Amino acid sequence: MDQIDEFLDKVNCTEKYMMEGNHDNWLNYAVEKYPYIPQYKFKTAVKLKERGYKYYPAGKYLKSLGKLSFYHGHLYGGQYHAANHLRKKGCSIMYGHWHDLQQHSITHDSGVKSAWSIGCLKDMSPKANGWLNYRDVNWSHAFAIVDFFKGGLFTVHIIQIIKGKTSLWGELITG
């Protein structure tokens, strides 16, 4: 969290949101099982209130900015999870739980709605994911840039990172 806050401070971010995910929620399960360790409840352990974050617990909670909603993304899965999210949520939505890249759109009378699975930024090597029995995963390194416009409209740009390299606004970025 310190690294995230440091970056957000550098870009003068004034609104910070934390949507709890399934891994974060493991701390809450431990506190339920062992109530004498309440300081390990997720939002307490990472000091979200002190850091100035608006907190959304794990589950069905959505945060909407304009006409785009965000949440962790673990409620609907399968091979076509972006289509499942769009069909079941019924709104434009972005999530990260599945760590891969998918996008699905549908046009209604009210306009186009889309769902995006935006990948991840973690080490995807089998060695770093021993908890998955060292199997290969269908994950992708990526992040999203979202531009918001008047009337709640927005555009989404998914920036995929291949072997530590990407191109953003005409500039090669390596890491």
PLM regions with names:
Residues 4-5, 56-60, 78-83:
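A generic local structural motif
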Residues 15-22, 56-60, 157-161:
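Acidic carboxylate-rich catalytic motifs and surrounding loops in phosphoryl-/glycosyl-chemistry enzymes
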Residues 1-51:
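Core catalytic region of metal-dependent phosphoesterases/phosphodiesterases
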